[in-house]
Amino acid sequence: MEEGLLRHENDRDDRRITACVILSTFVAVCSSFSYGCANGYTSGAETAIMKELDLSMAQFSAFGSFLNLGGAVGALFSGQLAVILGRRRTLWACDLFCIFGWLSIAFAKNVLWLDLGRISLGIGVGLTSYVVPVYIAEITPKHVRGAFSASTLLLQNSGISLIYFFGTVINWRVLAVIGALPCFIPVIGIYFIPESPRWLAKIGSVKEVENSLHRLRGKDADVSDEAAEIQVMTKMLEEDSKSSFCDMFQKKYRRTLVVGIGLMLIQQLSGASGITYYSNAIFRKAGFSERLGSMIFGVFVIPKALVGLILVDRWGRRPLLLASAVGMSIGSLLIGVSFTLQEMNLFPEFIPVFVFINILVYFGFFAIGIGGLPWIIMSEIFPINIKVSAGSIVALTSWTTGWFVSYGFNFMFEWSAQGTFYIFAMVGGLSLLFIWMLVPETKGQSLEELQASLTGTT
């Protein structure tokens, strides 16, 4: 009976949400706010930058896509840096790249400094996209892990909202300085938050694992069971594998790798990067006011992200991903139909509003699932021994595919507005099958329980 009571007390400690967990999450997700600002920046600043620096459409498309190119570089080294430096110091490095990138854009006198800043910003957000969800997943109690991890998407959307709302009325250089400001919070804040206990276990700092857990769960919490579970699972995985790059291709990890890469391909090939970067071009083509569209969109993006944050630990990951795929596919299809009707000169008075409404539909469903859950699931499904290599490959997939979409979007859109969105709708339909057949539910399980079930480790 005493053993049962102790287990109950330990479970209660594991579920505790402390001020330290909240502070640590806040410090980490400030980087995601800058990520959101970077995503929305090209849409709001497009006209002013092209006019002041005399850029062609090809040059501006390249500038927009360099965020993804830099992101691919950051993603390639993100996992290794997170192991060598730890999660906290990697967060610090992310923000140094972002600060340099934003300031380079803000003071750019020519396209070279503009592009250099965008690439540096990309490297920073590429590191961010890996280390922030991993750090949050490793420090939070399992029953709220999804909601806390989803806060990254909330902050990203807050950054997008800020840029969309003010981008058409604030000078593009001032806008870049505003984008840099949140990056200073993690630069200072990392000195006040604990390191990930799972990273500490991996490097063999047994005493520090318990110290970190005590800060996260409370000084009076009994963290012995959680610390033991982390250390046993980490040791088991390390003994089972020498942690080489090729380990992730073992049969037992095949499903997790396919799921991680597949979700990132879905996220990018559904067109989100292109639509976010160049939404003003879509409004212009549809005949809808760019300023009004940007401001309404800016107000809309935050509540839609809140919905996903509230539902992720109630409904689970799979239902939200499935609903997201259906909604995005329908939204893309209806935008394509709108541009088809426009080309046929049918219902011209309704086309602008219809396109705008369906862009909101698309992004509403994007936000509750495919927008952020692939990163959350990536941070959950890979065991510590392959998290570096597999996580880096998955992040690299996202950024390289995002570069392809963001660079090619303007050219595709000029070729055929409706054809572009029909392609995105088709991707949404295929993603529904992929999610239904392969993606596991991760809600309510500890990372160790989840990874054991996926790999068959006992």
Curated annotation (Swiss-Prot):
GO terms for molecular function: sugar transmembrane transporter activity. Sugar transporter. It is found in: Membrane. It is a multi-pass membrane protein. Keywords: Membrane, Sugar transport, Transmembrane, Transmembrane helix, Transport. One of its GO terms (cellular component) is membrane. The chain crosses the membrane at residues 17-37, 66-86, 96-116, 119-139, 150-170, 174-194, 257-277, 292-312, 319-339, 350-370, 393-413, 419-439. It comes from the Eukaryota. This is Sugar transporter ERD6-like 10. InterPro entries: MFS_dom (IPR020846), MFS_ERD6/Tret1-like (IPR044775), MFS_sugar_transport-like (IPR005828), MFS_trans_sf (IPR036259), MFS_Trehalose_Transporter (IPR050549), Sugar/inositol_transpt (IPR003663), Sugar_transporter_CS (IPR005829). The keyword Cytoplasm does not apply. Belongs to the major facilitator superfamily. Sugar transporter (TC 2.A.1.1) family. CDD domains: MFS_GLUT6_8_Class3_like. The keyword Cell inner membrane does not apply.
